């Protein structure tokens, strides 16, 4: 009971101080296709190298001009300040999940040229070359889901076409369904800590509602049976409870979360909730006016927030126009800062920039 009371008291709370955030631009990936930027790549640190793989963009014509989206298979690694083409993914993939695990990356799900995939791979770097090992597939195809790691447990949450919450143990990589979301949520942000799983934002593709809420569920061994059987969210006594809401009243659709070494969740980017919600109801006649706006008019989030599970409070880490992105790749740096790679500047237009964030 104390846990839930503390959540209610902390709901929407943002610490009054702002940490000092430093933004440092990195070398661009030396490739003509990536020079136009990509969104939703796999992104993580393998060993000491930043890895950016896959992703999607509109390389020939813009979305406004009716251009076709292209999805990539390239694997790029930033080693000693220089980009190396480390190999190719088995499939051209975007909108998947990336987990950093013991010097390797686990790449799960995503969209392969218009089709949601259930494939999972382990990626390691050996002498600058990517080595990929197939892992057990997901129980169902997943993309645009939330993902998070807590100790030796990996979690995937929602996304396109599913309300499932799946978990696996590092080293075994056998995914089991451990819960269901109370509603479909595409592009939520997930975070696991202390035996609880948090979910923020996302949009419901059935009702077209864009969430500004947070949810939390106990997901430790005292609640989840050993056989990881499903906890149905539609039961009268749903295990989901309200968590502290998104601090600026917006949504985390299009945002990317990463767990910092100090145990907090950092969230980068995201769309403007009101503008995105209106766009979900656009008619064909609205398409050209909507896509013709300047990037600043979409009001993507510049602020970077951190959630502390110990206090139940959000802290503003800083704000910078460079962070006004949707679908950026985000990875935790060895020094505790973040790498940010690509993302959308506006619908259909990607950023080619990569940068680091430090506090």
Regions found by a protein language model. Give the residues of each.
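Sec-dependent signal peptide recognition
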Residues: 1-7
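C-terminal motif of bacterial Sec signal peptides marking the signal peptidase cleavage site
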Residues: 14-15
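Kelch-like beta-propeller repeat domains
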Residues: 19-359
């Amino acid at each position: 009971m104390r846990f839930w009371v503390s959540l209610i008291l902390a709901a929407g709370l943002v610490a009054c101080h702002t940490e000092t955030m430093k933004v440092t631009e990195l070398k661009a990936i030396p490739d003509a296709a990536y020079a136009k930027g990509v969104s939703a790549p796999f992104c993580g640190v393998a060993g000491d190298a930043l890895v950016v793989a896959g992703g999607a963009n509109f390389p020939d014509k813009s979305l406004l001009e009716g251009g076709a989206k292209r999805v990539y298979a390239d694997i790029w690694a930033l080693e000693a300040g220089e980009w190396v083409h480390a190999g190719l993914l088995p499939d051209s993939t975007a909108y998947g999940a990336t987990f950093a695990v013991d010097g390797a990356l686990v790449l799960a799900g995503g969209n392969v040229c218009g089709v949601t995939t259930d494939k999972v791979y382990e990626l390691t770097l050996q002498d600058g070359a990517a080595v990929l090992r197939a892992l057990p597939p997901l129980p169902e195809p997943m993309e645009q889901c939330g993902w998070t790691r807590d100790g030796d447990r990996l979690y995937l949450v929602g996304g396109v076409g599913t309300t499932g919450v799946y978990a696996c143990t590092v080293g075994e990589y056998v995914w089991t369904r451990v819960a269901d979301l109370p509603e479909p949520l595409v592009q939520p942000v997930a975070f696991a800590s202390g035996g609880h799983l948090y979910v923020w934002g996302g949009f419901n593709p059935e009702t077209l509602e864009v969430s500004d809420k947070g949810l939390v569920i106990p997901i430790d061994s005292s609640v989840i049976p050993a056989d990881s059987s499903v906890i149905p969210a539609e039961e009268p006594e749903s295990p989901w409870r309200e968590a502290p809401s998104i601090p600026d009243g917006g949504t985390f659709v299009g945002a990317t979360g990463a767990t910092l070494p100090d145990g907090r969740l950092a969230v980068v980017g995201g769309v403007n909730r009101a503008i995105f919600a209106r766009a979900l109801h656009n008619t064909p006649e609205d398409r050209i006016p909507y896509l013709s706006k300047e990037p600043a008019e979409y009001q993507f989030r510049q602020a970077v927030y951190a959630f502390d599970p110990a206090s139940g409070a959000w802290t503003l880490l800083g704000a910078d126009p460079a962070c006004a992105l949707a679908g950026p790749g985000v990875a935790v740096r060895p020094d505790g800062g973040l790498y940010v790679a690509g993302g959308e500047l506006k619908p259909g237009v990607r950023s080619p920039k990569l940068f680091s964030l430090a506090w």
